[in-house]
């Protein structure tokens, strides 16, 4: 049997997933149980859209709970004290110059479970994140992205 996938995460990321898991188990499950009770009170289940919707929501939430439990069970937490502060790793805040758009961008490197590109949290497994890992300020990298190659210069490396 193959080994379970390890999820590289920061302490902050683990805490966030634990909070989501707790919310789903305590609050959301109760809400859905109540919705199912109300829907059952309507009688005939064959055309009961409220019941179908509540059961679908229940399936989604239970699936997410299983996913979160698996991610937390297989979490590999990055000890930021073990990584030099000037080297890009998970937990680093990296300021880069994006040559394609001629702008400075700041990324936070996180594990794939924590990625949130809209908030500049990029995964260490993404093309750009992977290209930055192990590099230092002053390094220039070229990264293959879906629409070609992007070039970045690392301006600063800090810790979150």
Swiss-Prot record:
Keyword Transmembrane helix: no
GO terms (BP aspect): DNA-templated transcription elongation; regulation of DNA-templated transcription elongation
Ranges in a coiled coil: 12-76
Pfam families linked: GreA_GreB, GreA_GreB_N
UniProt xrefs under InterPro entries: GreA/GreB_C_sf, TF_GreA/GreB_CS, Tscrpt_elong_fac_GreA, Tscrpt_elong_fac_GreA/B, Tscrpt_elong_fac_GreA/B_C, Tscrpt_elong_fac_GreA/B_fam, Tscrpt_elong_fac_GreA/B_N, Tscrpt_elong_fac_GreA/B_N_sf
Keywords of the record: Coiled coil, DNA-binding, Transcription, Transcription regulation
Family annotation (PROSITE patterns): GREAB_1, GREAB_2
GO molecular function annotations of the record: DNA binding; RNA polymerase binding
Family membership: Belongs to the GreA/GreB family.
PANTHER family registered for this protein in UniProt: TRANSCRIPTION ELONGATION FACTOR GREA
Primary role: Necessary for efficient RNA polymerase transcription elongation past template-encoded arresting sites. The arresting sites in DNA have the property of trapping a certain fraction of elongating RNA polymerases that pass through, resulting in locked ternary complexes. Cleavage of the nascent transcript by cleavage factors such as GreA or GreB allows the resumption of elongation from the new 3'terminus. GreA releases sequences of 2 to 3 nucleotides.
Protein's UniProt name: Transcription elongation factor GreA
């Amino acid at each position: 049997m193959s080994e379970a996938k390890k999820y590289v995460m920061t302490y902050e990321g683990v805490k966030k997933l634990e909070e989501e898991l707790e919310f789903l188990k305590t609050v959301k499950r109760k809400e859905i149980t109540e919705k199912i009770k109300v829907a059952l009170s309507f009688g005939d289940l064959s055309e009961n859209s409220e019941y179908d919707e509540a059961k679908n929501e229940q399936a989604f939430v239970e699936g997410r709970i299983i996913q979160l439990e698996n991610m937390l069970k297989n979490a590999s937490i990055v000890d930021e004290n073990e990584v030099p502060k000037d080297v890009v790793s998970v937990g680093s805040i990296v300021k880069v110059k994006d040559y394609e758009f001629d702008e400075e961008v700041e990324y936070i490197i996180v594990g794939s479970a924590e990625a949130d590109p809209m908030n500049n949290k990029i995964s260490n497994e993404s093309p750009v994140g992977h290209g930055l890992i192990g590099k230092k300020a002053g390094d220039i990298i070229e990264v293959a992205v879906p629409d070609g190659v992007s070039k970045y210069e690392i301006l600063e490396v800090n810790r979150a």
